[in-house]
């Protein structure tokens, strides 16, 4: 069974291995993106990025914890790069910002309180175990957030996708850490299937899910 599972993953990677790099233009705004996120990618639920909490609807987990959508590459970083003003100003005046914040490759389900805790803090490693919540391997210190190991590869590939797709900056120290996370936590079958679903919805793939070793070629 395990061998068949691995072969299936390989088949998915080979079948959809052609690179597609062009700004997504099929989802014009975040409201549409949210509808597609909950209604088309996760109509039957999944697990939250940071805590692995199972959910079957768009409002809460199975044990009643409120949900939200996490932008792995924070929207505040996008605004800083575009210099388009605050969130409302950027939504009103920058089409590029609207497309960036609506890119499904950068969006994951998260517990609302954990999403709020992370804010726009960069990811990193906190020296000692410092769980913010007793039900979740998520750590927070001033100016740094440490996700659970099983989420780190997804996070790395999302950030590098946003960097290449939109020219968004990534700090060199963070890039080095994310490259290691990509090595340690390769794409799962679910991440590969999600890549396929998103391509159907917005016309772009994350090439680093298809070819994670290409991340090593990125220069910072």
Identify the residue ranges that each predicted region occupies.
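Intrinsically disordered, low-complexity segments enriched in polar/charged small residues
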Residues: 7-8, 80
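Aromatic-lined ligand-binding clefts that engage carbohydrates, nucleic acids, or primary amines
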Residues: 23-66, 177-180, 190-191
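Cleavable N-terminal signal peptides
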Residues: 8-10, 20
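Domain-level detector of nuclease and nuclease-like folds
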Residues: 61-68, 72-220
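General helical structural elements
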Residues: 6-7, 197
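Positively charged n-region of N-terminal signal peptides that target proteins for export
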Residues: 1-4
């Amino acid at each position: 069974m395990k061998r068949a599972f691995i072969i299936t993953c390989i088949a998915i990677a080979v079948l959809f291995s052609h690179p597609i790099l062009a700004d997504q233009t099929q989802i014009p705004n975040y409201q549409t993106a949210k509808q597609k996120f909950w209604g088309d990618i996760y109509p039957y639920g999944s697990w939250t990025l940071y805590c692995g909490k199972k959910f079957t609807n768009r409002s809460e987990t199975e044990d009643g914890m409120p949900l939200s959508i996490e932008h792995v590459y924070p929207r505040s970083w996008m605004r800083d790069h575009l210099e388009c003003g605050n969130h409302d100003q950027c939504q009103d005046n920058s089409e590029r910002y609207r497309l960036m914040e609506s890119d499904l490759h950068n969006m994951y389900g998260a517990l609302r309180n954990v999403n709020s805790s992370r804010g726009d803090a960069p990811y990193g490693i906190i020296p000692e175990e410092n769980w913010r919540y007793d039900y979740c391997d998520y750590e927070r210190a001033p100016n740094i957030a440490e996700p659970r190991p099983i989420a780190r590869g997804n996070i790395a590939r999302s950030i590098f996708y946003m960097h290449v797709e939109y020219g968004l900056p990534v700090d060199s120290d963070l890039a080095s850490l994310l490259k290691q996370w990509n090595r340690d936590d390769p794409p799962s079958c679910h991440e590969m299937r999600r890549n396929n679903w998103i391509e159907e919805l917005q016309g772009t793939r994350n090439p680093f899910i298809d070819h994670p070793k290409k991340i090593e070629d990125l220069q910072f």
